[in-house]
Amino acid sequence: APSGPSRPQTPTAEDEALRRAPFQPVITCELAGEAETLTEEQQQAILSYTTMLCTALARPDDPLPEEPYTTDTLRQEALTRGFLWSSYIWGEQRVQVYPMNPIYRSEDAVEVWASLRVEANYSSDLTQTTGDTFGYGSLHHLTLNRTAQGWQVVGDDCEESDLCGYLSGCGTASLPSEDILAAIQNYLDLRAAVMAGRTPAAPDRCTAPLREDAQALAETAVDEYAVIYDVQCRPAYFAPMQQSGETVQVTLREILRVDHLRQGVIAATRTSVDHTLTLRQQTDGSWQVCGDSYEALGHTCAVTP
């Protein structure tokens, strides 16, 4: 397996503290405006859901607890949204939620617009949890259903492309099957690990030419970023999968986040890489990435099966 690039500079033992600062985010969410047009249970579901969005913003690399106020799909969407914001460390967040124009589709289903007005402390120095203050607003079209456990947010139509590049569904729409998705994630994780100088966890999930390409990309990343502390990635914006016999073709956008030394501090740069992947099913039923086409950091890949 590739061991990662040689660096002009390598983080020393003293630099181990210079990582993303671990912290417990301070989040305050309040309802305002026409909140009284909703029941207390509906209000609580919206507040809990908004708190989850803020938690994912502050800690996008950590799993969210499974709570009854929303669905697994929206939890994954929240983490994708948070990852897109994660070029910064987000500390205290103060949110006012303005519900508007609730429409009851039935006794057990309601749609409501929710305007979020957020004031957050953030830092571009990843070792700090306080810095500047940033205020922004976003509009969410929420769908709530009544379940046996109470009211649950089951839909969130939101566009924040001008803020962080997020569009509703970008993390969960048109997903391939779980086994194919796992092979894709393992392949992307391998590339990120090599770029960060880590040992890949599952190097056999892609072919030797793609492992060699990961090494070449890592060398290019050193030229771009010099000292790399960490690299994380997320797949998003999947196109519908194309299948032909024992191979499938998947088009997606990889969201790549590189923590690196910039002007004397640890900072993050986020970039997007559009991939066209080819996967082949193995004799044991698992899937292996055997082809990729992309351009990133001035590097071009055109590995065919």
Label each PLM-derived region with a short phrase.
Residues 107-175, 245-305:
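Exposed beta-sheet edge and beta->alpha loop/turn motif
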Residues 8-11, 37, 86, 95, ...:
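Intrinsically disordered, low-complexity, compositionally biased regions/tails
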Residues 53, 77, 81, 86-87, ...:
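Polar/charged side chains located within well-ordered beta-strands of beta-rich proteins
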Residues 93-105, 230-243:
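Short amphipathic beta-strand and strand-loop transition segments with alternating hydrophobic
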Residues 15-93, 169-229:
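Core segments of small alpha/beta cavity-forming domains
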Residues 17, 63-64, 110, 123, ...:
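Intrinsic disorder/low-complexity detector
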Residues 2-16:
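Ser/Thr/Gly/Pro-rich low-complexity, disordered linker/stalk segments of secreted
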Residues 8-10, 20-21, 44, 147, ...:
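Positively charged, low-complexity intrinsically disordered regions
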